[in-house]
Amino acid sequence: MPGSDGNVRVILDLNNQTFQENLFSLQKTERHAALDTLSKIRQMTWQQVYRDKGLKWEKIFSVRAPQGVDAIYALRITQSRRATAFRDGPYMRMLTVAADHDSTYGKK
């Protein structure tokens, strides 16, 4: 995960259709909390993302990453929701906002 490029600022990619549908279907309060988290991430370096205890960036071992992607990661996007994403150079490419904790890890 962390490498010599850990001090590179994160560039968010929110253009995944599933991610957008999940995000915009959240209740207003939760949606605003998610947007606050995304705004926070946008100001961080990758090293800060890896160390941030609130985000809890962690590799998902129970879900196979698509071809060309090293790994899928989960991160806390609101107090009760986790999102999935992967790193692509400086980009954090968002994939989903899970309806519940277990579905983030492919258990449902």
Predicted regions and their residues:
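Basic, Lys/Arg-enriched alpha-helical interface segments
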Residues: M1-R81, R87-K108
